[in-house]
Amino acid sequence: MYALLLRVMFLVPPERIHHLAFAAMRVAARFAPTRALVRRLAVVDDPILHSTVFGVPFRAPLGLAAGFDKNAEGVDVWGPFGWGFAEIGTVTAQAQPGNPAPRLFRLPADRALINRMGFNNHGAARAAEQLRARTATVPIGANIGKTKVVEPAGAAADYATSAALLGPLADFVVVNVSSPNTPGLRDLQAVESLRPLLRTVLETVADGGRRVPVLVKIAPDLSDEDIDAVADLAVELGLAGIVATNTTIRRDGLHTDPEDVAAMGAGGLSGAPVADRSLEVLRRLYRRVGDRLALISVGGIETPEQAYQRVLAGASLLQGYTGFIYGGPFWTRKIHRGLAELLRRDGYTSLTEAVGAEHRGPRPQADTA
């Protein structure tokens, strides 16, 4: 059924259908009868999936990745639609229009998207207003980025402005230095640039008077050495975790016609083609930091089996966006139900018990004698 609907929706320009679908979801979540129906169809409340990560309780591990709800307009939508949490943004200190359209493209043959949105959003002050009014029952993270017109020398102060506005209202803050669509942003992933930026954000959030976990989001295109350096820095500074990974600028291995891909132009590629590298980065990070940091894995997750693989590889939480687009409004139910079944199949009593299990070797078999 959804496959047919998806074909119809794909007749509409991607950004337009995004706004229409998002509006429909907000309407469904606004009224008690439709909200109750959606919740019954989407929510999986299974104790085996409950966990506490960086001091925040999560009733389910799959969250909505940043990029869908840029302005925190749907914070009360995501719980009823089965998400364990959601990340708003990316939000910048100043409102900005983003890059010129067209800036969002579909690659159905690859179950992927290319975007060069450019952090289009209404600004941190507007997002803060939305967060103040929320009644959300799931954790909400605030993903913050650099305002495009701000020079690199002013990046730390720019991030601090967003952190000061959103930190007191969010359950966690994610520092995004990995989008390929803001010129020079990825240069901030270099440790010598990242250290003062993260310190400033940490100090700003601490000044807000409540403990708010701070994470950093990294790109899949970093070298292994740079991944290690960021991981070491995160531990050094006392970050709560790392979100891995953002979109990639690579285009190799795609099934979509190369001429069509070239015509789409620059931007970050998300979806199935990112899965292998995202898993690779996750494994490297866990080997580096173990349980000293929480790892949120995002990139190419489509099935319960892939979700389970990420947990075993070291992910305490998961995120999706492109999988949601191709999987439909109740995709979260499929992932959560399947993940719970896989955990029980292998003898785990909780999600937390399974995090990073592949790095600890085979599980001992129960004595049946």
Curated annotation (Swiss-Prot):
Any one cellular-component term (Gene Ontology): plasma membrane
CDD domains membership: DHOD_2_like
Reported function: Catalyzes the conversion of dihydroorotate to orotate with quinone as electron acceptor.
Pfam families associated with the record: DHO_dh (PF01180)
Classification via InterPro entries: Aldolase_TIM (IPR013785), DHO_dehydrogenase (IPR050074), Dihydroorotate_DH_2 (IPR005719), Dihydroorotate_DH_cat (IPR005720), Dihydroorotate_DH_CS (IPR001295)
Topology term for the membrane: Peripheral membrane protein
EC nos: 1.3.5.2
Disulfide topology: none
UniProt-annotated binding residues for substrate: K70, N115, R116, M117, G118, F119, N176, N181, N246, T247
Cofactor binding annotation: Binds 1 FMN per subunit.
Protein name (database record): Dihydroorotate dehydrogenase (quinone)
Gene Ontology MF, one: dihydroorotate dehydrogenase (quinone) activity
